[in-house]
């Protein structure tokens, strides 16, 4: 959902450039939002808060953050907690232009963190998207040639490899701590030797061995 939300920035931009979104479509969109999420119960967070947050943030993406006075009155009245929270997430998405694979990845990573911060504030379960969602890497040619140890930290995790039924390792970017890849634990090799072998490879070598797609910028 969060990744799709950022991609919708590009989709909506193209649709509006080609005049595919008019007032009728916008009215239908608002009706769809009202049909999807109920108004908040007074003064408390319920089980629908997460859905409200996602739906309203997507609404802001659809309208480029600009609602009519009438629509704004409706959402602020019906969703007094979720609406300002959605505005915060939208501010993360729209802080910088989303127009390249690199800027899209950056927005997704920041959105994962902002979403979890909001879930924590509401005392709701967090997504842990930074650790458990693998986001495709966007690398420069120089980064391709770096050793894995220069760009990533590899850790034990609670993830299980679905084929080997063993615990997996995750590779986190040093810069933003986002999950970049998941490695199955070796069946027989000691972990120290395994880590050294992985860290000694270039990033390009590791990704090619894993058949892991990435984008060059």
Write out the residue ranges for each language-model feature.
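Post-HExxH zinc-binding segment in Zn-dependent metallohydrolases
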Residues: 1-27
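Pan-zinc metallopeptidase signature
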Residues: 22-177, 183-189, 215
